[in-house]
Amino acid sequence: MEVLKAILYGIIEGITEWLPVSSTAHLILLHEWLKFDLTPEKEEAFMELFNVVIQLGAILAFVIIDWKNLWPFGLAGKKESTKKTKKTKNGVSADPRWSFGALAVKQNSIFLWIKIAIACIPGFLYGILLDDTVETYTDAYKTTIIGIMLILVGLVFLLVEHRIKVKEKKPKVKLLTELSWQTALIIGLAQVIAAALPGTSRSGATIIAGLLLGLSRPVAVRFTFDLAVPTMAGASLLKLLKYIKNGLVLSGGELTILIVSSVTAFLVSFIAISLMIIYISRNKDFKPFGIYRILLGAGVLLYYLVIAG
């Protein structure tokens, strides 16, 4: 039974990690209705660890899919074209290289990682300095905060898309190579809001920030996905260290839950990522996600504040 629960958690994570609907909110809500068979003294600490570590499986799927753009090294072969960068639908461009003997270094990948590192600075500082303090205040009202943030961010998505349509604003940044370090830093600050307030959605916050800063939808999504790699890896490491520091040790059953959930999230993510990239590349907007968030948030508030009271 625990394995089946772990598979369900993995499916939910694999789908929602790549949509701006807050995967953490979905996992927390699922845990409210479908709990693992854990001892009371370990349940809270384990689920806090679980909700972060399970995301590593999903992130690994994206690393494999986008490996060619993320990995900056290769073998020097034919001379790379130095002509003007070619624009593509999904925000990826031609990649000139530096050659060092037999080693070739892709310029765009190096510059992308520099911008990712800059965007990670706010989240790193938050995780080290404020994470525990903020969690102390938000834990008691977690489901209420989730409901409110699902609705608020959903409304922001609708407003941003309406603004783009009414003003017929064309994106200023249509390629990842055109993304400035200042823009990357602001997007990184948006991540902190998501880290502090459950239900915000890390991808939702960064995509909204990107759209407001003039990024095209494909570029906003691509950078959001790229940024998830070090962000979630770092968050998982931080949670694991805290778990160990508190003297807790994973049992065989808990380790099985983590592995099964992560592997499931990994497999499901291949489908979810591909569908999301196809959806955005066809110039579709984020209104459906905004509407979904509002409906889910309203349902959460109705249940926990009125029905469950």
Give the label of every model feature segment:
Residues M1-G309:
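Multi-pass membrane proteins that catalyze or facilitate reactions on polyprenyl-/lipid-phosphate substrates
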